[in-house]
């Protein structure tokens, strides 16, 4: 029963034809406050849904504000982890929601954030293991946001990223979100070393639209199964068109020039 349940839910957060996904995380309100692009969640969810996003990531308290109730459906991933930028250690992620709560709120998947190499790594790994067990029992897909972060750690280093991704898979995640390592070859080794699908994180707002589209193209060429991009989508001049441009690369194998031409049209 749980196997078919998980299959059904996963198909709500991916494209059934390409088997890839465009996820738009909108969980930044806890860590960063009401930043640009997230002041009106309903408006932003609508914009990315119209652009073809497969799923959004929200915290439990704002699910109602992000529910469309009309038009194209968009998958719901409820984020279970949190920390704020004002904390003594923002890398210390704690659980603020349960799998059962997420199910009651209508989630299609849950996500957990782990900072590998942080001072509280042990706690975060233990909680990831616990959540993967519970999620598995309920047939709930688990997205693990795995980042190498801590004193003296280069969070874009290939070996560090590969380790973080592999840890998430080893502890039971169904999909891994992690940093791009800067080029196709190194990220391909990250993907090849992870036995579950990898989606690339967008990170901080980039300098240009072309920069983000180029990163997406390189990640897909390396074998990524999609993206989980927040600020570079919802803080774009036109979030709907940016979502569509990224979707063209992820689902239709468009090149950067094609996606950029659409974005500028």
Swiss-Prot record:
> Which Gene3D superfamilies would you find in this protein's record?
Aldolase class I (3.20.20.70)
Task: State the UniProt keywords alphabetically.
Answer: Amino-acid biosynthesis, Aromatic amino acid biosynthesis, Schiff base, Transferase
Q: Which Pfam family is one of those matched by this entry?
A: DeoC
Per the entry, what this protein does is: Catalyzes a transaldol reaction between 6-deoxy-5-ketofructose 1-phosphate (DKFP) and L-aspartate semialdehyde (ASA) with an elimination of hydroxypyruvaldehyde phosphate to yield 2-amino-3,7-dideoxy-D-threo-hept-6-ulosonate (ADH). Plays a key role in an alternative pathway of the biosynthesis of 3-dehydroquinate (DHQ), which is involved in the canonical pathway for the biosynthesis of aromatic amino acids.
Question: Which lineage?
Answer: Archaea, Methanobacteriati, Methanobacteriota, Archaeoglobi, Archaeoglobales
For 1-deoxy-D-threo-hexo-2,5-diulose 6-phosphate, which residues are the binding ones? 27-31, 147-149, 202-203, 230-231
List the protein's name.
Putative 2-amino-3,7-dideoxy-D-threo-hept-6-ulosonate synthase 2
Q: Does the keyword Amino-acid biosynthesis apply?
A: yes
Task: Give the E.C. number(s).
Answer: 2.2.1.10
Question: Can the keyword Transferase be found in this entry's annotation?
Answer: yes
* Annotated GO biological process: amino acid biosynthetic process; aromatic amino acid family biosynthetic process
The positions flagged as active site in the entry are 27, 147, 177
Task: Name the InterPro entries on file.
Answer: ADH_synthase, Aldolase_TIM, DeoC/FbaB/LacD_aldolase, DeoC/FbaB_aldolase, FbaB-like
């Amino acid at each position: 029963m749980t196997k078919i349940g998980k299959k059904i839910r996963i198909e709500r957060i991916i494209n059934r034809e390409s088997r890839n996904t465009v996820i738009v995380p909108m969980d930044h309100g806890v860590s960063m406050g009401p930043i640009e692009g997230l002041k009106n969640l309903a408006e932003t969810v609508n914009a990315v849904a119209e652009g073809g996003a497969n799923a959004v990531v929200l915290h439990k308290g704002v699910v109602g504000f992000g529910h469309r109730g009309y038009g194209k459906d968009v998958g719901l991933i409820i984020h279970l982890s949190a920390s704020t930028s004002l904390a003594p250690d923002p890398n210390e992620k704690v659980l603020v929601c349960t799998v059962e709560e997420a199910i009651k709120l209508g989630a299609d998947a849950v996500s957990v954030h782990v900072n590998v190499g942080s001072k509280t790594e042990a706690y975060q790994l233990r909680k990831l293991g616990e959540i993967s067990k519970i999620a598995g029992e309920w047939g709930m897909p688990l997205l693990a946001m795995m980042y190498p972060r801590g004193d003296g750690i280069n969070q874009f280093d290939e070996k560090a990223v590969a380790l973080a991704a592999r840890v998430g898979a080893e502890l039971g995640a169904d999909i891994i979100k992690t940093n791009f390592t800067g080029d196709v070859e190194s990220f391909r080794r990250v993907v090849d070393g992870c036995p579950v699908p990898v989606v690339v994180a967008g990170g901080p707002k980039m300098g240009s639209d072309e920069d983000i589209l180029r990163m997406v193209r390189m990640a897909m060429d390396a074998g990524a199964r999609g993206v989980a991009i927040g600020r570079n989508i919802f803080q774009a001049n036109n979030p709907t068109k940016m979502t569509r441009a990224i979707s063209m690369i992820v689902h239709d194998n468009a090149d950067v020039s094609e996606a950029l031409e659409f974005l500028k049209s």
